[in-house]
């Protein structure tokens, strides 16, 4: 089973946040479409997407705060977040979800 551990912890700028991400493929393996696992526990953090993202919730509930509204997904449900969105990811308790991003090399497009 694919999982995450402390080596996959994401730096959100807040040391109390518990966010873990693990890419499933390298850019060499999948140069256009990125995919990975994300797990969060009792955390809310801001994020601006310069890529399109779909999140498939495996367990728990994922809330995305966007433009003053909250969209939520539970197990077996999918969220779509369009490129250019300034959001806040939020989880109460624990959630595990798969993310799919296009383009896969979004980090090289941030300008830094």
Mark where each language-model region is:
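Short glycine/serine/proline-enriched coil/turn segments at secondary-structure junctions
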Residues: 29-30, 46-47, 89
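Short acidic-glycine-tyrosine-enriched beta hairpin
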Residues: 67-84
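Ligand-binding loop in jelly-roll beta-barrel domains
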Residues: 83-107
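Conserved strand-loop elements at the edges of beta-sheets that form or border functional pockets
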Residues: 49, 56, 75, 83, ...
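Short, charged, solvent-exposed linker or helix-capping segments at domain edges/interfaces
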Residues: 109-112
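Conserved hydrophobic/aromatic positions in well-ordered beta-strands
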Residues: 25, 34-38, 55, 98
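Short, conserved beta-strand element in jelly-roll/cupin
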Residues: 39-42, 48-66
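A short, N-terminal "cap"/entry segment at the start of jelly-roll beta-barrel domains
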Residues: 1-34
């Amino acid at each position: 089973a694919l999982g995450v551990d402390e080596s996959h912890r994401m730096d959100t700028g807040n040391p109390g946040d518990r966010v873990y991400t693990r890419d499933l493929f390298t850019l060499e393996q999948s140069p256009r479409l990125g995919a990975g696992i994300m797990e969060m526990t009792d955390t809310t953090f801001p994020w601006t997407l310069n890529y399109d993202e779909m999140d498939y919730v495996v367990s728990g509930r994922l809330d995305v705060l966007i433009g003053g509204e909250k969209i939520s997904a539970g197990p077996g449900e999918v969220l779509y977040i369009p490129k250019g969105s300034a959001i806040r990811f939020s989880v109460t308790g624990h959630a595990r979800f798969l993310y799919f991003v296009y383009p896969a090399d979004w980090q090289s497009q941030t300008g830094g």
